[in-house]
Amino acid sequence: MKKRAVYSIIIIMLVFTSCTIGGSFYMLNFSLTPNAKILSKDADSYPYMYRNYPFLRPWVDSLKQVNALKDTFIINPQGIQLHAFYIAAPAPTSKTAVIVHGYTDNAIRMFMIGYLYNRDLGYNILLPDLQHQGESEGRAIQMGWKDRIDVLQWMNIANEIFGDSTQMVVHGISMGGATTMMVSGEKQKPFVKCF
């Protein structure tokens, strides 16, 4: 009887451990490599933004009309091609914002924050697509840790695009906020003023 109870406990523990390990790997795979239905696509992002933030349509249309909404690409140290949009301020300025999106989003879905910085505050803005999101390549979402290196590279690119005397703020939402805080722990260039 005692032997049977010990075997039952061992079997229950093995089943529980197997379920925990299997579930952990499933959730890890689901979180880092979500299927196409979960990731925000560029084609779906514009209608989403216009529906939820109607004030964006005239601004984005005017930017496109005068070719002020620009794309740029870089290759990160791991050889992954990354994408970003950038928009110069309405009047020349050294103030620049790098705006980092959240989990499964893309740069387009940060246009409402870009509008605030660019149109209302008069900043130059750069909106990167993090790895495996938007138009950027990558095998998996990095949850901010590896993205911090990419954002540091984007900060240097923004400084080159908008002039070498920039005063830069780095702003992130959700996972982009976590990425921004990870960036803040790295050695910063003098042009970075706040996070």
Q: Which functions belong to the PLM regions below?
A:
Residues 141-162:
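Alpha/beta-hydrolase active-site loop
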